[in-house]
Amino acid sequence: MAKKTKSKVNTINAKLQLVMKSGKYVLGTQQALTTLRQGRSKLVVIANNCPPIRRAEVEYYCTLSKTPIHHYSGNNLDLGTACGKPFRTCVLSVTNVGDSDIAT
C-alpha cells in the first residue's frame, strides 16, 4: 500500500516539474485567488497543511469558477520543493499546463 502511494506522489511531482518547465503557473494564495476570479486557472493544487480559512476560501472560488482542485498529500514545504522552489507554498494555480497532462 505504501508503495502505491509513493508512486502516486512521484507521478504528481513529475507532472508538477513538467508544468514548471513548459507551462505557466502562480504560487501563493493571493495570486491563485486572482487567477481564479479572472477565470484563468486550469487547476489548483493545495498542500495538506494549508490553514483551514485559506483552504475554504480557495475551494469556494474553485467551485464558483468550476476549476478542479488537487489536494497535495505532502505539506507546504514538500509542495514548494516539488515545484523546484527553495521556499514553502500552500497554493499553486496552473494557468497553462504546457506539455503536462496534470489537469486530466
Curated annotation (Swiss-Prot):
One Gene Ontology cellular component annotation held by this UniProt entry: ribosome
Keyword annotations from UniProtKB, A to Z: Ribonucleoprotein, Ribosomal protein
UniProt key word Nuclease: no
Matching Pfam families: Ribosomal_L7Ae
GO molecular function: RNA binding
InterPro entries named in the record: Ribosomal_eL30-like, Ribosomal_eL30-like_sf, Ribosomal_eL30_CS, Ribosomal_eL8/eL30/eS12/Gad45
Similarity-based family: Belongs to the eukaryotic ribosomal protein eL30 family.
Protein name in UniProt: Large ribosomal subunit protein eL30
Naturally occurring in which organism (per UniProt): Leishmania major
Lineage, uppermost ranks: Eukaryota, Discoba, Euglenozoa, Kinetoplastea, Metakinetoplastina
Gene: RPL30
